């Protein structure tokens, strides 16, 4: 399965709010050229919460077509209603995605029993591998390692994206879930340590703007070359911080636009474009990371 540097891809949009497929194709080509190991289409960073189901599935399917077998694509299939998650999963069944990434149901705060029932039902609706996604800072529910361990026995649940930033969970998840269960970091600031502790990869926001360097860091960490990984990672720490000066994906979408990779930085309400007070911060950290700003 997929190890290494995985981009949580933004979804570019036209000024009228429709999806900008020309820019999306450009982004896919950019990540192929930069050596990114895989793409997550329409996850949190891809504005999944504001894409209706048919549009969500269409963006995932088109991303796979643009990739044309040259880079694996993982499709986001999270929803806070199990029936909706199943419907979304079925709509991508023949898309060509190599796996699906499903965030814990948000807002309604399911119990561990509810999480197990939810993910088991979604997994049963498809033969495509499923990756769990724990990000309590956004969902208000924390899926503990013990719950993940129970779900790891489901044949097509193959891994988890753990975005708490709690590095103690790496060893605990590995102990409970076994060596074959895939552990992905969802926190750029602690990703290097996550990999050195035994993680398999990183599903990254920063990878949208520093893919070559982020890939090099991941490769070094996976090879257990801690010194090289730190040397590559250190200049990126400012980027990691500045990309969360406002809610993701507001800053990263603005940054990708300033790189000239997408036609404009339109983002769907209730999110709004990056506040002017943060423009200077982001430009400065991008320049420090040797990113060309246009």
Curated annotation (Swiss-Prot):
Localization terms from the record: Cytoplasm
Site residues (Part of a proton relay during catalysis), renumbered to this chain: 44, 107
Gene3D superfamilies to which the protein is assigned, alphabetical: Aldolase class I
GO biological process, one term: lysine biosynthetic process via diaminopimelate
Coiled coil: none
Record-linked PROSITE patterns: DHDPS_1, DHDPS_2
Enzyme's top EC category: lyase
Active site per database record: 133 (proton donor/acceptor), 161 (schiff-base intermediate with substrate)
Gene Ontology MF term list: 4-hydroxy-tetrahydrodipicolinate synthase activity
Highest taxon, organism lineage: Bacteria
Binding-site residues for pyruvate, renumbered to this chain: 45, 203
EC number: 4.3.3.7
Keywords (A to Z) from UniProt: Amino-acid biosynthesis, Cytoplasm, Diaminopimelate biosynthesis, Lyase, Lysine biosynthesis, Schiff base
GO CC annotation: cytosol
Catalytic activity as recorded in UniProt: L-aspartate 4-semialdehyde + pyruvate = (2S,4S)-4-hydroxy-2,3,4,5-tetrahydrodipicolinate + H2O + H(+)
Pathway note: Amino-acid biosynthesis; L-lysine biosynthesis via DAP pathway; (S)-tetrahydrodipicolinate from L-aspartate: step 3/4
Function noted in UniProt: Catalyzes the condensation of (S)-aspartate-beta-semialdehyde [(S)-ASA] and pyruvate to 4-hydroxy-tetrahydrodipicolinate (HTPA).
PANTHER family named among the record's database cross-references: 4-HYDROXY-2-OXOGLUTARATE ALDOLASE, MITOCHONDRIAL, DIHYDRODIPICOLINATE SYNTHASE
Family: Belongs to the DapA family.
Quaternary context: Homotetramer; dimer of dimers.
Record protein name field: 4-hydroxy-tetrahydrodipicolinate synthase
The species this protein was found in: Shewanella frigidimarina (strain NCIMB 400)
